[in-house]
Each structure stands twice: as structure tokens, then as C-alpha cells.
């Protein structure tokens, strides 16, 4: 048993609990009842902290520290691993393949059994002999001067003094460092922290009949020095690469030895040289720079930074546009969409070096200038490169992501993409869905040699792909960027990775793994969770899903209500025991005693939106009618295209049309009927703020009105306080000892940082003078400490405040304190606060 005594973290009421080890345990209860406080903030935090304390103090300073949870004791605890939904990697270089490490196994497989092809003609290529190299060099024009180079250092940092000493001892006279030839007797400038390429000059020759013997000897020497590699510097021409490994006899192309790093898009040896392994480029988009092409330039059609002054007749920008209009015979008052393509090309891409006469009158006088116009796109591109980081972020709102022209989104250089296994290169393999890959790996044809070498690697790949398939992610591809995954998908990927790691004796803490998962895939997930338990692990799952609760070995129901009214253990036991427990609301729903009523009469729509020809991601050119004025649910199995339709097409297109947002909608032909709406609002689960200074009162805007009330009291007027006095973000009214935080951080170096209440204000955030001002007997601190439920009664006679409070209560947040830091709110709570903020506004009926 894991024995917990006196857990008091957040809203937990000093609870004692025994959780069975090596079992599948579900923590359930109302939103905000304290499930996460017990599972993550208490059990996981303590398990992680104890593991950290077993490390040396030197190691601990690099790993960061964990605060000791507010609990008397926890016995029988294993090392804990948390699999939550928040820690998704947003790095564009991170993919499903890299986070699961399956891609690392594929890199190894392709390096060991892959068949290289010529990137130019596509023919399989094999190793070159010394004779073939001699023949190739003898084909050069007579009297061509060449240098035979042995590449001995490639892309490595350091001063490499020993390399130069050994070369000198061996009798060599010259080396080429980073493209420059140096004499070994001179001092060679080397930057220690820069990557260098070093080649020894083995021989220098002039191509002419009769040098074959010397050339053969020199080539053999070079190949021995550089492990079968040779570079030939043709003076006045290009450098030729030779290898005893692979070369194309037809095209004369030699490629490097195939290594695992050749297939890494995070390594210069494998990455596409144009996009550096990202697979895409950021480019300025005409549709974002000129969002409304029905407008003329004079009316402000050009919206991109640096060009808004085109509406000002006295600006230099307008003078250039006037000059172009005279030269190319168009009118700046004409709508942009009506210009011929030639005029659009001149405006966007420039005059191609042709100069136009610009008449400009500025502060220093007037003049005539001959200007070769570079084009709006090139101009803003230059401004973007020269801009500060903040301005770059602004410019990027006018840019879109386009696939790289060189690698077509496959991230790798052409030589790496030319290596195949079972007639597929590594990018094509990773573009298959997990479900397709399971079948392909079972049926793909390999030679006996390939099977022998790749047996162990393939075994690992098949096992890990199988785990992904088992958690209901059969629709994902290994090339999918992790930044595009939902919280539930990212969590299930980490779950599959943990099963692949094969750890035993661990306490896994999971946060609603079934979220976003279709019922069809739920059985797969539950089977996977049981497999993880059967390995010898303890599973603690925070969950509301009925199937998961019924499948669990043990359930802990926390409640009875949320927030201040929760934090107690209501019931424990098996699903059957919970159903029989009269105190458990969860049990009443599981047993069917309480049900959510299905409406007998449905509302009728007030109109329809029609999406025509939706083709984003996996959508098959579909037309969809969405009724307006009613509650509509878009559903389907995981990966069916729901988010592509709603988030990528519908939201982005309507945001662009109605909110003038700079968004690029997903691929579709048209949306009909949006003239019936006046705005669109997206409410997701992202935090309402990133710091403890953000809270429900500040987010909903109600704190401004509360501060106005305090500023209007007699005490405040007598002391000359304005509303700014009641802000904990400004000097004046806040406690300066803690800068309005209410807590002080004490750094303990090798121990966790300790947060203690401020000794001056005792955690109240404000100074004494500010706290003396009372409204209806309450200070500003007292108001921030109220729950939404209490605030509804307190502000019942102030409609503008009570309306917002009642809306927060109606979405089930009556237990949340007005000043509760946003960092303490769950994703669901943050989403409901956003929803309440919108619902409390006066409705136009067209949102």
C-alpha cells in the first residue's frame, strides 16, 4: 500500500488515504475537487522529490528542485513518472518519430541495410575502386591542375594541433583548413569553439598522359589516410568527392559513407541545406499583406508593416508608388484585384533593375531620384531580416509556412533521401500512418543479408509501432510535428514510449488519458494501461471516463463538491462498492441512479453556414452544412478530420473575414452564409495567464470595476487614492517588500527554493494604508480571497459585477477564488473562465 497521511496541498482537508500498489487506480470527482492536488501535487511531487534527493548535491543543482508537498508522510512510494497533457514539445524539430525514439531506430536501419541510389539519375550505386577513380581523373582536360586531399577532420570543434603535428611528422607540407590552403610550417589560425574541416594535401598534379602510376599511388595513400575518402580540388573548377564506398559511374557523383547521422534532420550531415532540416520556409504571403484586394492602394490595400503610409500622399512610400503608376500606366485609385498581372508583379516583385523617376518633397527640400524598385515582397523581407526580435514577431503575422523547394518538406538532403529500404526512403516510411506501417513492416521484402543485419532493429521498431497502435494513435504519422498534437494525443504518445521503455516498479500518474479519444479506441487504451500495470507498476489515473472507471482495480472518489467545499475522500473501493456508496455522486451516475436528461424537443436553426470543398489534411473535398443558432457537436473517430474542418478551415476563414485576423485558412473552395455572423470566438484550454499575477478577476475584467468601487469609497476619497492604488502590479498601494506577490522566494541553492508568506503584509499583497480602505466592511484583499459564490451575494446590487460572477458560477466555477493565480487553474477551468468572460458580454445574437 501507498499510505498518505495529512495531505493538505491546495484544497485538500488533511486527508489520510491508502492506495494499493501495483494496481490500476482511478482518482475521480468533480472538477476542482482536489484530484490533481492529490495525484500530481502530492504523490508525484513527493516521489520525484525523494528521487532527486538520492542524487548528489552537484547533480541536483542542474536538475532543478521540487518543493516538498504539504503532507505529513507518504509511505511505500515508488519513483514517480508523470504523464500529463501540458508538457507538449513545441519545438518545430520535434516529431512523433523523434519523441518516441522510433526514428532513431529507423536511422540505424537505413544506415546498415539501406541501398544508396544516385540522387541525380536514381540508379543504385556501389563502391568505387582505385582504378575507377584514376580513370575518372584522367578524363579531365589535359593540363588541368589538381590537388589530392585527404579529409581527416569534418565538422569538429577544436584547435586540432595534434592533427597538424602528425601530418608534419609524416612528411606532408600543406593542409587545407575550411577551404584555405596553409603551409604546415606556418601558424594556422584556428578558433577553438568553431567547427572545422581539415584536409591534408597529399599530392599536386597536372593531368597529362603518363601520370597514371603516380596518380594510383597517391590515391591509395589518400584513401588510407582518410578511411576510404578522397577529395580532389580541381584548380579553377569544382571539388570532386570520391569514396571507396558509393559513387555513380554515369553521373560521376560520389556520396559520403552512409551513417545514422546522414538521416538526422537535426544534424548538418543529414539536414536539407536550404531549410536546415525544418522542411518548410517562412515566406511573406500576398493574401496576408493585401488581405482585402477589393480596396485600392490609395484606400490602404497594403497592410504589411512599412507600407501603411501608402495612403499618405506626402510620404516617400506614396512617391515611389506614384512613380510606378506613371511608368506602368495604372491608377492607385483602382481596386488591387483589377490590376493586370504585369502590374501586380511589378508591385510585388520589383522592376527587375529598371529605374523610375521618383518626385519627392520632404523636410529637406524636394528632388527627383532614379530608383530601381525592388518590390514589396523583397522590401519587407529585407526589413524583416534587419528587425529586432519584437518586430520580427510582428512581421511574421504576414508570413505563411510553405514547404521547402529543395526537399519538398522531407527535411533531409537529397543524398539521404536517395537511400531506400523495401523501395521506400526514410521520409516516405515516416509519412505512412502508424496503422499502415504495422502492415507494411510485416509484409516488406528484404534480402537475406538485410534480414540478418536488421533483425534486432526491426524487432524494436515493430514493438514500438505496435504500442502506438495500441493506444489508439494508428492515424498518426511519425513525421507529424509534436506541436500540432492535442494534449490527449501527446499524453498517449508518452504513454506508448513508457511501455516501450519496459520499466517496472514505477508509480505512473496520468491526467485524463482518454480525453479526445473516440469510444472505439477506448478499449485499446484501457488494454494498454492494464499492460503497463501487469509489468509491475502502480497506475494512478485522474479520470472522469465511465469505461476507465469500470475497468479500474480501485477507485478513489474525491469531493463532495469543488474548491473550498471539496478536498475530502468521499468513497474508496471497486466500481461496485462506489456504486453502492450513498455519499458518492460519481457512484450515483455510474449506477444509473442519476442521469443527464436528453432534451425532448430540439431547437430549430436560424440559418446555415456551408463549407464547400474542404480538402485540408485528410478531408476528401467535402461539403458540410453547419446550422446556426443552436448547439452543434462535431464528432468522429480520432484523426477523422474534425479539427481540420473546425479549427483549420471554419475558424481561420471566419476570423479572417469577420475579425480581420491575419490567418491563412486550410484548403477549401468557399464558405457560404458567413454574412449572417458578425464575429467568431475560439475558446481553448490554453492558460488565461502565465504568471501568478493573472487571475479570474483580472481576466474577466471585473477587477477594474472592483478597484473603481474601492476608489469611490469615502476613505479612499479622503486619502486621495485613485483606482491605481488598489492594483498589486503598481507601486503605491501594493506591499513593496514582496512587490505585490504576497510571498517571498528564498533560494536554498542545493535544497528546493522555499516560498514563505511576506513578513510585512502576511501574504495580503497590499500595504497597511491600502488595506484600511473598506467597501461594505471588506478590504481589497478580502474581496480577492472570496469565492465566486460569495462574490455573487456580496456584489448582488452591482449588476455589471454580479452578471460576470453569476456567469462564472453558472459554468461550474462557484468554488474558484477571485484572486486564485492562473498557474493553479486546470486547462478545463481556464477554458470555462474564458467561456464565462464571453457569455457575460451582451450578445449580438450573431456570434
Predicted regions and their residues:
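Conserved phosphate-binding elements of NTP-dependent enzyme cores
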Residues: 1-847
Amino acid at each position: 500500500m501507498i499510505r498518505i497521511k495529512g495531505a493538505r496541498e491546495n484544497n485538500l482537508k488533511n486527508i489520510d488515504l491508502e492506495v494499493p500498489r501495483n494496481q490500476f487506480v482511478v482518482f475521480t470527482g468533480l472538477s476542482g475537487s482536489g484530484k490533481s492536488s492529490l495525484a500530481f501535487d502530492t504523490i508525484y511531487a513527493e516521489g520525484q522529490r525523494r528521487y532527486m534527493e538520492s542524487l548528489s548535491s552537484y547533480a541536483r543543482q542542474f536538475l532543478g528542485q521540487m518543493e516538498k508537498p504539504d503532507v505529513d508522510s507518504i509511505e511505500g512510494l515508488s519513483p514517480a513518472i508523470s504523464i500529463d497533457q501540458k508538457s507538449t514539445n513545441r519545438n518545430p524539430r520535434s516529431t512523433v518519430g523523434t519523441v518516441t525514439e522510433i526514428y532513431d531506430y529507423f536511422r540505424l536501419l537505413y544506415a546498415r541495410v539501406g541501398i544508396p541510389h544516385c540522387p541525380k539519375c536514381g540508379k543504385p550505386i556501389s563502391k568505387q575502386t582505385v582504378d575507377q577513380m584514376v580513370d575518372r581523373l584522367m578524363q579531365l582536360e589535359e593540363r588541368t591542375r589538381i590537388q589530392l586531399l585527404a579529409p581527416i577532420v569534418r565538422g569538429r570543434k577544436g584547435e586540432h594541433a595534434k592533427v597538424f603535428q602528425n601530418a608534419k611528422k609524416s612528411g606532408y607540407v600543406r593542409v587545407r583548413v575550411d577551404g584555405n590552403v596553409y603551409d604546415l610550417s606556418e601558424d594556422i589560425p584556428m578558433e577553438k569553439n568553431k567547427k572545422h574541416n581539415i584536409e591534408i594535401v597529399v599530392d599536386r598534379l597536372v593531368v597529362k598522359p603518363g601520370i597514371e602510376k603516380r596518380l594510383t599511388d597517391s590515391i591509395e595513400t589518400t584513401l588510407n589516410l582518410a578511411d576510404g575518402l578522397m577529395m580532389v580540388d580541381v584548380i579553377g573548377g569544382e571539388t570532386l568527392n570520391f569514396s571507396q564506398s558509393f559513387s555513380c559511374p554515369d553521373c560521376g557523383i560520389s556520396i559520403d559513407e552512409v551513417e545514422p547521422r546522414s538521416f538526422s534532420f537535426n544534424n548538418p550531415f543529414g539536414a536539407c541545406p536550404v531549410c536546415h532540416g525544418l522542411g518548410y520556409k517562412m515566406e511573406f504571403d500576398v493574401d496576408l499583406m493585401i488581405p482585402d484586394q477589393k480596396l485600392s492602394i490609395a484606400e490602404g490595400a497594403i497592410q504589411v508593416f512599412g507600407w501603411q503610409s501608402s495612403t499618405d500622399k506626402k510620404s516617400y512610400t506614396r512617391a515611389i508608388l506614384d512613380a510606378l503608376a506613371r511608368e506602368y500606366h495604372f491608377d492607385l485609385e483602382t481596386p488591387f484585384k483589377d490590376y493586370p498581372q504585369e502590374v501586380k508583379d511589378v508591385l510585388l516583385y520589383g522592376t527587375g533593375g529598371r529605374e523610375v523617376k521618383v518626385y519627392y518633397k520632404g523636410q529637406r527640400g524636394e528632388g527627383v531620384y532614379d530608383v530601381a524598385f525592388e518590390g514589396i515582397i523583397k522590401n519587407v523581407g529585407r526589413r524583416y531580416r534587419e528587425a529586432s526580435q519584437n518586430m520580427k514577431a510582428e512581421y511574421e503575422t504576414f508570413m505563411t509556412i510553405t514547404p521547402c523547394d529543395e526537399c519538398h518538406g522531407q527535411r533531409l538532403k537529397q543524398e539521404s533521401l536517395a537511400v531506400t529500404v523495401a523501395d521506400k526512403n526514410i521520409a516516405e516510411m515516416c509519412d505512412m500512418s502508424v496503422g499502415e506501417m504495422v502492415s507494411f513492416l510485416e509484409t516488406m521484402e528484404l534480402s537475406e543479408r538485410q534480414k540478418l543485419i536488421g533483425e534486432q532493429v526491426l524487432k524494436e521498431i515493430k514493438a514500438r509501432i505496435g504500442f502506438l497502435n495500441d493506444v489508439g494513435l494508428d492515424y498518426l504519422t511519425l513525421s507529424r510535428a509534436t506541436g500540432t498534437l492535442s494534449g490527449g494525443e501527446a499524453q498517449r504518445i508518452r504513454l506508448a514510449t513508457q511501455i516501450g521503455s519496459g520499466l517496472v516498479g514505477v508509480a505512473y500518474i496520468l491526467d485524463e488519458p482518454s480525453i479526445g479519444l473516440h469510444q472505439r479506441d477506448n478499449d485499446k487504451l484501457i488494454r494498454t494501461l492494464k499492460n503497463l500495470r501487469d509489468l509491475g507498476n502502480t497506475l494512478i489515473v485522474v479520470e472522469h471516463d465511465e469505461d476507465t472507471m469500470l475497468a479500474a482495480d480501485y477507485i478513489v472518489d474525491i469531493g463532495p463538491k469543488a474548491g473550498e467545499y471539496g478536498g475530502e475522500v468521499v468513497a474508496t473501493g471497486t466500481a461496485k462498492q462506489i456504486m453502492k456508496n450513498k455519499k458518492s455522486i460519481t457512484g450515483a451516475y455510474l449506477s444509473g441512479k442519476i442521469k443527464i436528461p436528453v432534451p425532448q424537443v430540439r431547437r430549430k436553426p436560424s440559418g446555415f453556414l456551408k463549407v464547400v470543398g474542404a480538402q485540408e489534411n485528410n478531408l476528401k473535398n467535402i461539403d458540410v452544412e453547419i446550422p446556426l443558432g443552436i448547439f452543434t457537436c462535431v464528432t468522429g473517430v480520432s484523426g477523422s478530420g474534425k479539427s481540420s474542418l473546425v479549427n483549420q478551415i471554419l475558424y481561420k476563414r471566419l476570423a479572417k473575414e469577420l475579425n480581420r485576423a491575419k490567418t491563412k485558412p486550410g484548403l477549401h473552395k468557399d464558405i457560404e452564409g458567413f454574412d449572417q455572423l458578425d464575429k467568431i470566438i475560439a475558446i481553448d484550454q490554453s492558460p488565461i495567464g502565465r504568471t501568478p499575477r493573472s487571475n479570474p478577476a483580472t481576466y474577466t475584467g471585473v477587477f477594474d470595476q472592483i478597484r473603481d468601487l474601492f476608489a469611490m469609497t469615502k476613505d479612499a476619497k479622503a486619502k486621495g487614492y485613485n483606482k491605481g492604488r488598489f492594483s498589486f502590479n503598481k507601486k503605491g498601494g501594493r506591499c513593496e517588500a514582496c512587490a505585490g506577490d504576497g510571498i517571498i522566494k528564498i533560494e536554498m541553492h542545493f535544497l528546493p527554493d522555499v516560498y514563505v508568506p511576506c513578513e510585512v503584509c502576511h501574504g495580503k499583497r497590499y500595504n497597511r494604508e491600502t488595506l484600511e480602505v473598506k467597501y461594505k466592511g471588506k478590504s481589497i484583499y478580502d474581496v480577492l480571497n472570496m469565492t465566486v459564490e460569495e462574490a455573487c451575494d456580496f456584489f448582488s446590487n452591482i449588476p455589471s459585477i454580479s452578471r460576470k460572477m453569476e456567469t462564472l458560477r453558472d459554468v461550474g466555477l462557484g468554488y474558484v477564488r477571485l484572486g486564485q493565480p492562473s498557474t493553479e487553474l486546470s486547462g478545463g477551468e481556464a477554458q470555462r473562465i474564458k467561456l464565462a468572460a464571453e457569455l457575460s458580454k451582451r450578445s449580438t445574437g450573431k456570434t
